[in-house]
UniProtKB/Swiss-Prot annotation:
Record field: catalytic activity: 1-aminocyclopropane-1-carboxylate + H2O = 2-oxobutanoate + NH4(+)
Organism field: Burkholderia pseudomallei (strain 1710b)
Role, per record: Catalyzes a cyclopropane ring-opening reaction, the irreversible conversion of 1-aminocyclopropane-1-carboxylate (ACC) to ammonia and alpha-ketobutyrate. Allows growth on ACC as a nitrogen source.
GO MF assignments: 1-aminocyclopropane-1-carboxylate deaminase activity; D-cysteine desulfhydrase activity; pyridoxal phosphate binding
Active site: S78 (nucleophile)
Protein's UniProt keywords contain Hydrolase: yes
Keywords: Hydrolase, Pyridoxal phosphate
Protein name listed in UniProt: 1-aminocyclopropane-1-carboxylate deaminase
Single biological process term from Gene Ontology: amine catabolic process
Gene3D superfamilies: 3.40.50.1100
Length: 338
C-alpha cells in the first residue's frame, strides 16, 4: 500500500490522541474496553474534525490547479462546510458554501448559530437553499461552481463530506496507518473500530487502511443517514476506488463493508431517545461531548452493542470521534435541562 505518493498539506496537529473511556467501560459492565481516538481535537482551524483530515489530501490538488475558491455543500449545520471555510481562510482562498435544508428540525436560531455562524465569521459566502437531504451530487452545488466561473474565478469542487471525490478516501487510510503506529506503542491491537457513516469516505478510507492488516471487516460503521442502502453503496464504491489508488493489492468487496443500520433513525439529523441518552451518558461519565446528528448516533451504536453482548468479552474497541460538537448550539432546546 502506498499512501506516501500523494502530496499532503498539513492542516492538523499531527497524530490524534487515543483516550481510554474507563468510566463508560465500567458503567457498561467492564467486560469490553472502550477507547476514543480524538479526531474532534485534530486541528486549530475552527475546531477541526474528520473533514480536516480529508482536506489535507484535497488541498494540494486545489493549489496545483491554481484554484482560488473552495466550493462545498452540506446541510445548514454542516461540519464539512465549516471546516472548508476554515481551511479557505487559513490559505487566503475564497469560499462559497451551499447550505441545504437537510434536517427536518425547526428552531428560531438554527441557521444562525453553531457551524454556519462560524462559517460566516470566517468570511465564507454562505448560500441557503431549501432543498432536502441527499448525499449525491446536487444541482445547487453545480450552480455555485458555475457562478464562480461566470464571475471569473477558478473554483475547486469539494462534494459533501469530501466523499465522492477522487482523493476523498485518502485521509482515513492515513487514520488506519496512524492507529497501527499507536497500537505498536500501546502494545495491543484494537479488535473493532466504530465510526459514524453518512457520505461514506471516512469509513471507506478506514476499510482500505485496515484491510492492509486483515481488519477491514472490524471497522463497524454506524449509519446516521437513515438511508443506509445509499450510504453502503457509496462506502463500497469509494473504498474500491481508494484501494486502487493506494495500490492495496487486493479488491475490496461487500463483505468488507459492515454498516449497522439500527441507530440512524428517525431520519438524518434528528436524534432518537437512544441518541440523546448516549450523548448525556458519555458527557456525564467522561466529559466527552458528542452531537445529535453524527457522533451521538455512533456512540449510541457502540453503547448498545456492548449492552447486547455483540462485542466478545475482553474486546478492545476504538471509537472514532469525528467531531460535530459545534452543532450542539443549534439543538439547545433538546438539552435545555442538560
Amino acid at each position: 500500500m502506498n499512501l506516501q505518493k500523494f502530496p499532503r498539506y498539513p492542516l492538523t496537529f499531527g497524530p490524534t490522541p487515543i483516550q481510554p473511556l474507563k468510566r463508560l467501560s465500567a458503567h457498561l459492565g467492564g467486560k469490553v474496553e472502550l477507547y476514543a481516538k480524538r479526531d474532534d481535537c485534530n486541528s486549530g482551524l475552527a475546531f477541526g474534525g474528520n473533514k480536516t483530515r480529508k482536506l489535507e489530501y484535497l488541498i494540494p490538488d486545489a493549489l496545483a490547479q491554481g484554484c482560488d475558491t473552495l466550493v462545498s455543500i452540506g446541510g445548514i449545520q454542516s461540519n464539512q462546510t465549516r471546516q472548508v471555510a476554515a481551511v479557505a481562510a487559513h490559505l487566503g482562498m475564497k469560499c462559497v458554501l451551499v447550505q441545504e435544508n437537510w434536517v427536518n428540525y425547526h428552531d428560531a436560531v438554527y441557521d444562525r448559530v453553531g457551524n454556519i455562524q462560524m462559517s460566516r465569521m470566517m468570511g465564507a459566502d454562505v448560500r441557503l437553499v431549501p432543498d432536502g437531504f441527499d448525499i449525491g451530487f446536487r444541482k445547487s452545488w453545480e450552480d455555485a461552481l458555475a457562478d464562480v466561473r461566470a464571475r471569473g474565478g477558478k473554483p475547486y469542487a469539494i462534494p459533501a463530506g469530501c466523499s465522492d471525490h477522487p482523493l476523498g478516501g485518502l485521509g482515513f487510510v492515513g487514520f488506519a496507518e496512524e492507529v497501527r503506529a499507536q497500537e505498536a506503542e500501546l502494545g495491543f491491537q484494537f479488535d473493532y473500530v466504530v465510526v459514524c457513516s453518512v457520505t461514506g469516505s471516512t469509513q471507506a478510507g478506514m476499510v482500505v487502511g485496515f484491510a492492509a492488516d486483515g481488519r477491514a471487516d472490524r471497522v463497524i460503521g454506524v449509519d446516521a443517514s437513515a438511508k443506509p442502502a445509499q450510504t453502503r453503496e457509496q462506502i463500497l464504491r469509494i473504498a474500491k476506488h481508494t484501494a486502487d489508488r493506494v495500490e492495496l493489492g487486493r479488491d475490496i468487496t461487500s463483505a468488507d463493508v459492515v454498516l449497522d443500520e439500527r441507530f440512524g433513525g428517525p431520519e438524518y439529523g434528528l436524534p432518537n431517545e437512544g441518541t440523546l441518552e448516549a450523548i448525556r451518558l458519555c458527557a456525564k461519565l467522561e466529559g466527552v461531548l458528542t452531537d445529535p446528528v453524527y457522533e451521538g448516533k455512533s456512540m449510541h451504536g457502540m453503547i448498545e452493542k456492548v449492552r447486547l453482548g455483540e462485542f466478545p468479552a475482553g474486546s478492545k474497541v476504538l471509537y472514532a470521534h469525528l467531531g460535530g460538537v459545534p452543532a450542539l448550539n443549534a439543538y439547545s432546546f433538546l438539552f435545555r435541562d442538560g
